[in-house]
Amino acid sequence: MPCPSQSSDELEFFVNGKKVTEKNVDPEVTLLAFLRKNLRLTGTKYACGTGSCGACTVMVSQHDPVCKKTRHFSVMACLVPLCSLHGAAVTTVEGVGSIKTRLHPVQERLAKSHGTQCGFCSPGMVMSMYALLRNHPQPSEEQLLEALGGNLCRCTGYRPILESGRTFCMESDGCLQKGTGQCCLDQKEGDSSGSKSDICTELFVKDEFQPLDPTQELIFPPELLRMAENPEKQTLTFYGERITWIAPGTLQELLVLKAKYPEAPLISGNTALGPAMKSQGHFYPVLLSPARIPDLRMVTKTSGGLTIGACCSLAQVKDVLAESISELPEEKTQTYRALLKHLRSLAGQQIRNMASLGGHVISRHYYSDLNPILSVGNATLNLLSEEGLRQIPLNGHFLAGLANEDLKPEEILGSVYIPHSQKREFVSAFRQAQCHQNALPDVNAGMRVLFKEGTDIIEELSIAYGGVGPTTVSAHRSCQQLLGRRWNALLLDEACRLLLDEVSLPGSAVGGKVEFRRTLIVSFFFKFYLEVLQELKADKRLLPESTDSQRYPEIADGSRSSLGDFQVTLPQGVQTYQRVNSHQPLQDPVGRPIMHLSGLKHATGEAVFCDDIPRVDKELFMALVTSTRAHARIISIDSSEVLDLPGVVDVITAEDIPGNNGEEDDKLLAVDKVLCVGQVVCAVVAETDVQAKRATKKIKITYEDLKPVLFTIEDAIQHNSFLCPEKKLEQGNMEEAFENVDQIVEGKVHVGGQEHFYMETQRVLVIPKTEDKELDMYVSTQDPAHVQKTVSSALNIPLSRITCHVKRVGGGFGGKVGRPAVFGAIAAVGAVKTGRPIRLVLDREDDMLITGGRHPLFAKYKVGFMNSGRIKALDIECYINGGCTLDDSELVTEFLVLKLENAYKIRNLRLRGRACMTNLPSNTAFRGFGFPQGALVTESCITAVAAKCGLPPEKIREKNMYKTVDKTIYKQAFNPEPLIRCWNECLDKSSFAIRRTRVDEFNKKSYWRKRGIAVVPMKFSVGFAATSYHQAAALVHIYTDGSVLVAHGGNELGQGIHTKMLQVASRELKIPMSYLHTSETCTAAVPNTIATAASVGADVNGRAVQNACQILLKRLEPVIKKNPEGTWRDWIEAAFEQRISLSATGYNRGYKAFMDWEKGEGDPFPYYVYGAACSEVEIDCLTGAHKKMRTDIVMDACCSLNPAIDVGQIEGAFIQGMGLYTTEDVHYSPEGVLYSRSPDKYKIPTVTDVPEQFNVSLLPSSQTPLTIYSSKGLGESGMFLGSSVFFAIADAVAAARRQRDIAEDFTVKSPATPERVRMACADRFTDMIPRDDPKTFKPWSIPIA
């Protein structure tokens, strides 16, 4: 390789209009790292590091001297090598606009449309929309969806983000609700006691937004324009510590370099090479960049086809194909249309902007979406070397890497030739993935057939599959055997048999889902068969007039439904809430849809998160070393090699902890043995994060494996491995009740786990002070007091010496209640030992590997009922997978059992729960805290009863629902009147009865597509079961200028607690919110705080803020009486002069929770949140894909403190719950290694998963006396309502099974992934696939529930 002692060339580019010149660029440095560390532009966030989430989105502008145009495109900064930006202009969120200078309309609209919650994803959302608007100032709705397809948000549910983007779009023709022909604004208001004049449907005022003026954007720097038009042809070389980057200026130079460094890969978009080098250990000392060579970006159109340069991005390829389709006759564009179809859903927009056609082809990934189509479309690869041009077909031989049909080490791919399709030729593409967009396919396919002229006899047939082998697999042998056959039903049967014989998938195949993937092989061909049959029937031009029309049989109406894919459209919806009383003063913000206080800062990137804090003097970085064994004794930890590495300062082990090493069963750092893969064993401290992370790979740990090793709930039950005693509630006489019923049904329910996937990973900054062993800690946590206590215990220092600061948290969902204390303590030990500040920021993979998530559940039920549907007895036994330590598993078990009954009064009821101990990372608190799993069990019982009775599930729900004031199974009294109102309004607003009939009519006519509709009720108990957690304090200071600082014990997680607290203070002090400010949550200002969790943050802290403000106002009363015409500032100045204290501590001694498990009774919860949701879906029975057509939610919020924030909480929780029940599948290896630990392997919902029609109504005229201003906490309750989508899918599956005469007493496990839906819709294709004996192979993954 080149000598690194040589001097590097200068790298020149622009950032936000300012020139940047770097003389010593390390090729391993990414744009994201440079922006954050070197330029201190921290608005661009690190969230995944693999280009899969969009948090690091920026815009890159480059001038193309060939077409004389400047391109603006969004990219993922975490993947962009800094070296690749020579001559480019980068725009970050700071360059778009700021609060300090001028807001850009994108930023303003995102914030004011309530499109930010935690705000961590917001800069990325802004940049994706901004890049779109730079290219299309008035985009279409389809373009908006495409632009945001690569951006993830875990908080909002996307609807308000899309709503903000819609304000820039071309006006549509209206918003007719799908299937009703009515405008969403014409919804019925239901049977509410509030009049229509009291109901509002506007959360923001569109007319107040500043207009978009495209002429005011940053221009492309003239200096870069000159560089592009008159490029320096010499080779640029950048030498790093380990890698050399060479960017030649001409094609010939590149070919010479490739001959000199034949093993050096070409790096273009870095979308494949980057993740491989980061996560898979690949390393290349020399990288060759073809970015400066225009020859490799050329596009040539000829009469026979398209030649596209290998360095063209996939986005450019997409544009070229779309242009050709618009210019050419349809018969010539079959292959182009198939490619374009996959390009719309392949990855996200940013990756399509970065990834090159050549890289996509050459990588030959088994999941490649384009190679199967290029292969069947007879594409040709133009290979270049010093020896000249060599052409090879992109066929099965190339894809298999056969010697004579592959690239030689000294060759590069110059371009790809894609011929036009021809008359009598049909080309189609198919793919099925966990989500519609930004998800790798489970299986994809390209298929092409050419018929002999005037016949349906096959002349050529090509079929290629992705996702069924190590690379794209060509079914060449099957195709050859089908030549000369007619396109009819006999061919279909023979083709399926041949394909299954040739395209074999072993039972242990990587990725699992083997039977599903086998089924897709033939399901896709059936779709292709029908598509071609339809075209043959419809297109008379293909056949001479004398051809017998009976040759092409009519496609049955039911089969016609399998044609085409689900179309994704921008969601529509309406949000309704009750207006504030007309007599309420205008300055009183309570009940109004106030924007999140940090909304504008979120949108401009000026909101400071934990890792955005500037590096402090002498700061070190920490990286964790985790166990690679599930259950083993630690024989030794050898760090000798590590301590000699550059930059490494120390290795922290359990021996370095001066105090307590955590709990007995939950150590901070492992001692003697490990209990799971991912347990933290030790930590490396180094000068930089890169040095620390590299050093962790050199720690040598010797293990001795121990038995037993338990992963599944079934394993734990067999070994009697439990974390705590059984929790049980029972009422009535179970035995007698079961003896006196008409029918009994028994069943099982499985609910998978769920990753928190907060956008901001776990992170902490610890700064030791010079005196008295004091520590300042900046932590991303929901419970700073717990961090403080854990650090105090570990270091043996008083709590008063440790100050924890929480400015804001980039999402928590329960995942930042307990775990941050562990990371904080480990970092604090390192800080004390080294005497230097320590920063610990977990990579996404480590975060997901270590921290655990929602408890997977397995339940058995037995239900006895009358033929009328009245349930007389119900016995449920639940087991949750707690992982290797107790954590919150006992509490989750208690809440699970307490909440299992949901909305139903069942006189004879037995509920039991156990937490299993397994060798997996400990599962922990998660939004809903057991209710989303438990309530799904109960609703599954309801569905089973309905099926047996032959009655609609909603009738069974109504018959068994609480109706009047009653007591729960644990003897707590409550009034279900709001529950009944929510249920009735949901049925009414959703037009359920009408749509139920329409769904049934649709299903009668459609065989391969089925619709389902379901409505579920909810009774969600709010609060902690421990009395000590129902307390809070606040500290309010009034300064002499009249400004007010409010401190309280709640933590801002995105749920808007700071906004709500200032609304409370504004009302109590009778001053505008502009006078009020809150800075952070700090244990020095408000001590002994409780976790911000259980939906009571605003309840308990609101009362404390209210109390403090009332104390202050009481003190000011004499001053105000003396000068009633004075201003607020006058009164404050007078009070100061009179030595009246302008500081007050407020305190709330809240609800006295009580639960006696021995007696099975108590009052554990202060109140309930009631709600109901109705969802309608359509499923594709051949692939398992589904489309969410409409969701209506009615929620009892009582008197909402802030309708905009509360609606956002409901929508966000619903979408997160929908993810739990449909897409978020957790996979572990048979050795206990978590596979799904990055966003490309673990799929949370995206913008394309939002229901097409998404309506939310807050129940009007509802009251509760227990909370601040009669409001309710809504942070968690919407989670379970996502199950309405699950039960709608199950309803659609049931319809399919009925039509196929298959038993309806089936169970779809949660999540209802495409795999599970497809396999539940059993048919001729699922019947024909081969099935393996489970004893003959080792599965890729294991079911932990």
Curated annotation (Swiss-Prot):
It comes from Rattus norvegicus (Rat). GO terms for molecular function: 2 iron, 2 sulfur cluster binding; aldehyde oxidase activity; FAD binding; flavin adenine dinucleotide binding; iron ion binding; molybdopterin cofactor binding; NAD binding; protein homodimerization activity. It is found in: Cytoplasm. Mo-molybdopterin binds at residues 117, 155, 812-813, 1094-1097, 1209, 1274. [2Fe-2S] cluster 2 binds at residues 118, 121, 153, 155. Its cofactor is [2Fe-2S] cluster; FAD; Mo-molybdopterin. The gene is Aox2. GO terms for biological process: xenobiotic metabolic process. It catalyses: an aldehyde + O2 + H2O = a carboxylate + H2O2 + H(+). SMART domains: Ald_Xan_dh_C, CO_deh_flav_C. It comes from the Eukaryota. Belongs to the xanthine dehydrogenase family. Homodimer. Binds 2 [2Fe-2S] clusters per subunit. Binds 1 FAD per subunit. PANTHER family: XANTHINE DEHYDROGENASE. Residues 9-96 form the 2Fe-2S ferredoxin-type domain. Coiled coil: none annotated. Its EC number is 1.2.3.1, 1.17.3.-. This is Aldehyde oxidase 2. It is an enzyme of class 1 (oxidoreductase). The active site is at 1276 (proton acceptor). FAD binds at residues 266-273, 347, 356, 360, 369, 413. AOX genes evolved from a xanthine oxidoreductase ancestral precursor via a series of gene duplication and suppression/deletion events. Different animal species contain a different complement of AOX genes encoding an equivalent number of AOX isoenzymes. In mammals, the two extremes are represented by certain rodents such as mice and rats, which are endowed with 4 AOX genes, and by humans, whose genome is characterized by a single active gene. [2Fe-2S] cluster 1 binds at residues 48, 53, 56, 78. Residues 238-423 form the FAD-binding PCMH-type domain. Gene3D superfamilies: 3.10.20.30, 3.30.465.10, [2Fe-2S]-binding domain, Aldehyde oxidase/xanthine dehydrogenase, a/b hammerhead, Aldehyde oxidase/xanthine dehydrogenase, molybdopterin binding domain, CO dehydrogenase flavoprotein, C-terminal domain, Uridine Diphospho-n-acetylenolpyruvylglucosamine Reductase, domain 2. Oxidase with broad substrate specificity, oxidizing aromatic azaheterocycles, such as phthalazine, as well as aldehydes, such as benzaldehyde and retinal.
